[in-house]
């Protein structure tokens, strides 16, 4: 779980090397700086990020807040700040909302039921610091670094979707085990390929995810959410597609060619593609049904 390892390193840095990130005995942080705001927390931790692929513009940042005992802290809202450095004053402040990443009655075994999601605007590439402080009785604050690259590694919003000839029920002769690791399989997500949908000028949602092999604490039941959205928009012309990420659905064989064609470096990823074949929106990692449904209404209907 790479995200968790990164956070453990961050916690070690902030706890063991106080002179780098915390005020010394001789000087206090500038009032209003991110460090000063963090110092107001009774318990200071590192955030567990759910998203990492960022480029300048509007950012959707998802994360978990976990206390020192390993317990998820999850009031409905959290105050959220972003700054260039810990000792700088934040240039953006907002409220992160807790989003349910499962589907009631469908998702039952996930240890994490919700993630915080914050929306901020970052004008240029660089390394930033963010602070989240859940609103509630427990005064806990979490920080982490956010690296904004010049360009996203995943397909950017506005670019043309790659016409991958992803497998379908027809090409697999109905053998669902070749197409999905989800149990039970949702055949409605396996009917169409990306290439055929682009040729038909059909708007669609495609998720690259592996229900069986996703091990990150923040990857969530993405296919369950996409299935629920498919049912919600069954009367529309929007198609919903699930693509596994490993060759032969076996992690030992590495990523499959469709995953590589889309230049993905993590999973899960969910993209909304318009009738014009261009990426309209995308979600890295987990998202809620509320978020996905709102995006479908805004961009695909």
Question: How would you label these PLM feature ranges?
Answer:
Residues 6-15:
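Bacterial N-terminal signal peptides
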Residues 17-21:
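Bacterial signal peptide processing site
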Residues 23-178:
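Contiguous segments within soluble domain cores/interaction surfaces
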